[in-house]
């Protein structure tokens, strides 16, 4: 049974365009299925998480990452008697707006769009789901419930101060109450993202030999698991060791998240979802100690992995591709596919830049490379 403060699909605020409910799926299950059937979701399998798809078959991509986040989110929500369908759905959609080549691609595209209000993958996720996906005759987008869209837009909490242009535009027709916190399920999806990416980026980085087990000594709360496992299993292989460490880390983080969230719910005597939205802090959270550990881990990954020679060299090439494609299309808009060119409002530069950014953001890594090579055939980029 759902808690009184859960997001009940039977009490959903509904969809922008009214639809008749189905008898065999609740509203959040319908949204999950709609997301899975989008082109944007399928393209995630060829978009970078940390390592370019060509680097190896076992490294995570945006699709596998999204699936892993969704399993964590669903488990946590179920344990707290919240809507596991909503938590899972938001988790599956949270990375839809990412560019090719991960954060390097996003930084490059944001720099290209500096004069045109920038680029945000979070806002791009909303744009994909409410405008760019063309699957229904009656409307653009996939017409998701209010609760799912709220959770995607408020992935990092309430939106205060300057608001992204597309989010502000959409909010005029479907008020997502940007200044409040999202549902508990959405908060779970956001922290499930943290749990998944810090754990699995560590795993992939060791697999890629960017870091080793000795370097994990900097993270004492993780290193203790390494020491314990080596002591217990004298002949444990490196591949098995990292799997065991990651498994323990994920369990530890989830357990901590559940404990602290239950404490917060009891302390605030939460009885309904509006109380969660109107609190002055996030109800779903880790303990103070674990938040500190997570912050240290993110710093470690940033310094030792994302800024490593290997990742920096790849990022440089990725930046060249994204910025090169942007310039090429802006210089000659006729190189865009006809259906994209039709989206431009006359030949106005701002509109042209936004359409070009939308087109590039939707590319997979391999399509971006192929397109760049085709348009710049004198200098093929093949050494990924």
UniProtKB/Swiss-Prot annotation:
Against CDD domains, the record matches this protein to: HDc
Domain of life here? Bacteria
The HD domain, residue ranges:
62-198
Report whether Methyltransferase shows up as a keyword of the record.
Answer: no
Is the keyword Magnesium assigned to this protein? no
Keyword terms, alphabetized: Hydrolase
Per the record, the GO terms for biological process are: dGTP catabolic process
One GO MF term on file is: dGTPase activity
Q: Which family does it belong to?
A: Belongs to the dGTPase family. Type 2 subfamily.
- This chain's protein is named Deoxyguanosinetriphosphate triphosphohydrolase-like protein
């Amino acid at each position: 049974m759902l808690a009184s403060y859960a997001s009940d699909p039977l009490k959903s605020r509904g969809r922008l365009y009214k639809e008749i409910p189905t008898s065999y799926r609740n509203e959040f299950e319908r949204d999950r299925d709609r997301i899975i059937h989008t082109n944007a979701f399928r393209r995630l399998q060829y978009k970078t998480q940390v390592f370019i798809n060509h680097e190896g078959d076992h490294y995570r991509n945006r699709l596998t990452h999204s699936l892993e986040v969704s399993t964590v989110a669903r488990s946590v929500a179920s344990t707290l008697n919240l809507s596991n369908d909503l938590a899972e759905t938001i988790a599956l959609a949270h990375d839809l707006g990412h560019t090719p080549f991960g954060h390097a691609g996003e930084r490059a595209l944001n720099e290209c769009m500096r004069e045109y209000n920038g680029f945000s993958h979070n806002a791009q996720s909303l744009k994909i789901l409410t405008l760019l996906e063309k699957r229904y005759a009656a409307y653009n987008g996939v017409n998701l419930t209010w609760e799912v869209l709220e959770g995607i837009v408020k992935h990092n909490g309430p939106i205060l101060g300057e608001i992204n242009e597309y989010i502000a535009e959409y909010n005029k027709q479907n008020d997502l109450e940007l200044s409040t916190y999202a549902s508990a399920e959405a908060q779970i999806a956001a922290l499930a993202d943290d749990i998944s990416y810090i754990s699995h980026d560590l795993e992939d980085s060791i697999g890629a030999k960017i870091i080793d087990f000795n370097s994990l000594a900097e993270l004492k709360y993780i290193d203790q698991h390494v020491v314990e496992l080596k002591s217990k299993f004298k002949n444990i292989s490196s591949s098995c060791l990292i799997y065991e460490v990651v498994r323990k880390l994920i369990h530890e983080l989830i357990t901590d998240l559940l404990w602290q969230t239950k404490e917060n719910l009891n302390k605030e005597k939460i009885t309904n979802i509006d109380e969660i939205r109107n609190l002055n802090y996030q109800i779903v959270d880790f303990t103070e100690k674990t938040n500190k550990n997570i912050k240290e881990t993110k710093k470690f990954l940033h310094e030792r992995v994302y800024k490593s020679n290997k990742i920096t060299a790849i990022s440089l090439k990725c930046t060249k591709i994204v910025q090169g494609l942007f310039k090429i299309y802006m210089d000659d808009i006729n190189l865009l596919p006809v259906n994209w060119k039709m989206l431009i409002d006359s030949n106005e530069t701002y509109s042209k830049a936004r359409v070009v950014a939308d087109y590039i953001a939707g590319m997979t890594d391999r399509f971006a490379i192929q397109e760049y090579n085709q348009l710049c055939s004198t200098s093929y980029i093949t050494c990924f």
